[in-house]
Amino acid sequence: MELRVSNTSCENGSLLHLYCSSQEVLCQIVNDLSPEVPSNATFHSWQERIRQNYGFYIGLGLAFLSSFLIGSSVILKKKGLLRLVATGATRAVDGGFGYLKDAMWWAGFLTMAAGEVANFGAYAFAPATVVTPLGALSVLISAILSSYFLRESLNLLGKLGCVICVAGSTVMVIHAPEEEKVTTIMEMASKMKDTGFIVFAVLLLVSCLILIFVIAPRYGQRNILIYIIICSVIGAFSVAAVKGLGITIKNFFQGLPVVRHPLPYILSLILALSLSTQVNFLNRALDIFNTSLVFPIYYVFFTTVVVTSSIILFKEWYSMSAVDIAGTLSGFVTIILGVFMLHAFKDLDISCASLPHMHKNPPPSPAPEPTVIRLEDKNVLVDNIELASTSSPEEKPKVFIIHS
């Protein structure tokens, strides 16, 4: 049996969590029998105080770091894929794996791995509804770096779209819940047995298999949404696995018996399969389509699926007020509008320098003066007939009847 204290000391009114196998019991101290406080209880209360006071901000900082690393990794991986195309090797979209021999691609992969580790920690300390929308920062970083290092165009409207994405993410962070609803691996296992989540997971898995084996071979190279939707749907499983493993690590250092629980091993297998699938199809999308187009659309779909999964699995929105729910939804819609501006107007040549020279309607060119020919001016008509016949001798002669 494991014991964990939820308050700073074992005073009257303090709460005790008792764990026995997969069961949890919450007890309250109603009378002091001894003035001494066990050292073990003091240690756990210190951990609980750190989690309650600083856990949200630690998760927020790790999410910022993760966004920067992931946004930079896309550029490095794209440069590796471009170098692969220059050598004439089989492209990733055609089933080639030549990028595995490229140092630039591996640099991008390791950078992405570091970003995912930071993301891993962020999900362990903060709710998924907070961490996931901060991926908009990686959209901003990826779009800006691609314009400098990949020579991909990013006009004024695209930059404005990036700013709108960041503003929407800020609104979501302000209104998102700060308290986690699942704090132990036993609670995670109980949530995953819920009927609503099981139905949701089965629907995602079936749709993903249809996309991979039926739709992607036919339309994947022509439609950018196919590969991106596959990565986004798989992302729901990877985020749930990351969240569960993060909770497992925290519980391990808290002294809970997580090693004997089967769920961490199942989540590790799910994470390995989902990440490998995501990397494969994201490489195919980056190999064909523009980076500044792939990453924003991927962010919108990925965030939508993950937030929906978090609502169903972790029930993070159940304790939120109507104002916070409306603010979170408004922030997400703002992000979608920013992403739309980022890729819908990417081909327009608009910059700050060109704005003063743009006119609503160009000035009309002066109309030519009409030539007036009177009916009685027979000499002019005859001259026109002669000029027409001499300029194009191959044409058949035309007969004009002049009425006097």
UniProtKB/Swiss-Prot annotation:
The keyword Manganese does not apply. Keywords: Cell membrane, Disease variant, Glycoprotein, Ichthyosis, Ion transport, Magnesium, Membrane, Receptor, Transmembrane, Transmembrane helix, Transport. One of its GO terms (cellular component) is membrane. It comes from the Eukaryota. Highly expressed in brain, lung, stomach, keratinocytes and leukocytes, and in all other tissues tested except liver, thyroid and fetal brain. GO terms for biological process: magnesium ion transport. Residues 77-102, 146-153, 217-223, 283-293, 346-404 are cytoplasmic. Residues 1-55, 124, 175-195, 245-261, 315-324 are extracellular. SUPFAM superfamilies: Multidrug resistance efflux transporter EmrE. It holds the Pfam family Mg_trans_NIPA. GO terms for molecular function: magnesium ion transmembrane transporter activity. Changing residue 114 to D: In ARCI6; frequent mutation. The chain crosses the membrane at residues 56-76, 103-123, 125-145, 154-174, 196-216, 224-244, 262-282, 294-314, 325-345. Glycans are attached at residues 7, 12, 40. It catalyses: Mg(2+)(in) = Mg(2+)(out). It is linked to Ichthyosis, congenital, autosomal recessive 6: A form of autosomal recessive congenital ichthyosis, a disorder of keratinization with abnormal differentiation and desquamation of the epidermis, resulting in abnormal skin scaling over the whole body. The main skin phenotypes are lamellar ichthyosis (LI) and non-bullous congenital ichthyosiform erythroderma (NCIE), although phenotypic overlap within the same patient or among patients from the same family can occur. Acts as a Mg(2+) transporter. Can also transport other divalent cations such as Ba(2+), Sr(2+) and Fe(2+) but to a much less extent than Mg(2+). May be a receptor for ligands (trioxilins A3 and B3) from the hepoxilin pathway. This is Magnesium transporter NIPA4. The lineage of its organism: Eukaryota, Metazoa, Chordata, Craniata, Vertebrata.
